[in-house]
């Protein structure tokens, strides 16, 4: 922990804000509006720059504001994080480290990790020395996260992992991944899972980048061939993988809704997902006085404002116990709708200029539209979010499942004959 971190113990939010304002001005580069840094999720240089900026934040005493002090954070409340976020607007920040490294992986380790795992990995991430990712989805798994078939077998004092994962966000830039593995096939599917903290560059791990329709390659697929891990790589206990994964999903839904106290900075973590400037779009397309454009833009901006207030309301509800943890899916669901409305509105304003023409800003609208469905998939599909809200928030009856209570070895699966 830095000396600056120690000084925050008796500091008010306003005092903290003033100190952050002065420190940012002296230590972090300002973003030039017309030449913002290209912090793309699929570029190695972006991740290297993010690590450098994170090291500055840690040295200055502004890293991990809401993480406990004993793991390298400041141990402060979300009000301090919000104050820092407001002051950091307009400065170059390591935003791509937020999701999934801080808001999902480190948050999950904080909940269920061993003391050694928390001390080693949360601290290293806050120092800018480690990046963590999620290794959950599988090639034949679809939306059934509990149906994983990557195998973990006991061999002496170690675990040997074989199988494959896919759609792992930014795994190429990570040092470790939270990997969900099946370690017992003779119990129902949710009971036979174990979560491992797996080194990405470990012998036996092969990683490949996935090319997207918009030209990005931020997602990866991984193949595990006799990957040997020690007992201390287990997170949350053997056979407790579903409980760990559920905490990950809770934190992922909150992060997708921009409501995590572990997220540092205001804007999106990807340069291609920055807030849309409707005024600039109207100006570029010669529609400044178009009533229809004004109405569409107003609706999108209003829904974004409602989403932000909703996130605060649900966060406080979960914090004080008046709402269950599963209420995080409400944020996830509403933010997906708000984000898609924003992109639909931008595409409607840009019209054909989003796909043809010489204006790069308008062409970017078209590129972003191609990936509009991502917000309906991250943290589980929109349909899953609705089921979670229905069953775990509103207490509706659960849907019928043919494999409920059946040993996983007896469950018919794709390709199992």
Predicted regions and their residues:
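Amphipathic, small/basic residue-rich leader segments at the start of a protein or domain
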Residues: 1-99, 120, 124, 286, ...
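Glycine-rich phosphate/cofactor-binding loops in nucleotide/flavin-utilizing enzymes
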Residues: 2-5, 9, 83-84, 104, ...
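Glycine-rich beta->alpha junctions and the first turn(s) of the following alpha-helix
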Residues: 7-11, 16, 205-308, 375, ...
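C-terminal helix-coil-helix/basic helical segment that borders enzyme active sites and/or dimer interfaces
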Residues: 32-41, 283, 287, 291-294, ...
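Internal helix-loop-helix
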Residues: 51-129, 170-176, 304, 311, ...
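A short, Trp-centered hydrophobic/proline-enriched beta-strand micro-motif
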Residues: 128-136, 180
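A structural signal for short hydrophobic beta-strand segments in well-ordered beta-sheet cores
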Residues: 150-153
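A short core secondary-structure module
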Residues: 157-158, 162-208
């Amino acid at each position: 922990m830095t000396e600056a971190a120690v000084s925050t113990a008796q500091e008010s939010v306003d005092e903290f804000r003033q100190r952050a304002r002065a420190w940012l001005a002296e230590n972090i580069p300002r973003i030039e509006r017309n030449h913002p840094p290209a912090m793309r999720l699929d570029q190695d240089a972006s991740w290297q720059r993010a690590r450098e900026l994170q090291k500055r934040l840690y040295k200055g005493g502004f890293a991990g504001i809401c993480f406990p002090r004993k793991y390298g954070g400041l141990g402060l409340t979300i009000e301090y994080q919000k104050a820092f976020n407001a002051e950091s607007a307009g400065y170059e920040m390591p935003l791509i480290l937020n999701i999934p490294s801080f808001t999902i992986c480190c948050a999950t380790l904080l909940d269920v990790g061993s003391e050694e795992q928390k001390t080693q990995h949360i601290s290293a991430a806050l120092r800018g020395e480690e990046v963590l990712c999620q290794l959950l989805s599988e090639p034949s798994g679809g939306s059934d996260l509990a149906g994983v078939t990557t195998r973990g077998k006991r061999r002496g004092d170690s675990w040997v992992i074989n199988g494959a994962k896919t759609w792992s966000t930014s795994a190429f830039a990570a040092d470790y991944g939270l990997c969900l593995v099946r370690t017992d096939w003779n119990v129902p599917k949710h009971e036979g899972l174990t979560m491992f903290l797996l080194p990405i560059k470990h012998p036996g791990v092969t990683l490949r980048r996935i090319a997207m329709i918009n030209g990005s390659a931020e997602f990866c697929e991984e193949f595990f061939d006799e990957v040997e891990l020690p007992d201390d790589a287990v997170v949350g206990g053997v056979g407790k993988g579903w409980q760990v994964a559920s905490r990950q999903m809770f934190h992922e839904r909150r992060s997708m809704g921009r409501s995590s106290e572990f997220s540092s900075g205001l804007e999106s973590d990807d340069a291609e997902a920055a807030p849309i400037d409707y005024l600039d779009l109207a100006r570029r397309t010669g529609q400044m006085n178009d009533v229809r454009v004004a109405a569409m833009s107003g609706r999108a901006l209003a829904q974004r404002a409602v989403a932000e207030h909703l996130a605060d309301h649900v966060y406080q509800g979960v914090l004080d116990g008046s709402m269950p943890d599963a209420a995080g899916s409400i944020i996830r669901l509403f933010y997906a709708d708000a984000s898609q409305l924003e992109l639909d509105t931008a595409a409607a304003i840009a019209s054909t200029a989003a796909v043809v023409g010489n204006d790069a800003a308008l062409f970017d609208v078209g590129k972003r539209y191609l990936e509009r469905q991502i917000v309906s998939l991250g943290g589980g599909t929109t349909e899953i979010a609705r089921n979670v809200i229905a069953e775990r928030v509103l207490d509706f009856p659960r849907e019928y499942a043919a494999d409920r209570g059946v040993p996983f070895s007896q469950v018919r699966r794709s390709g199992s004959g």
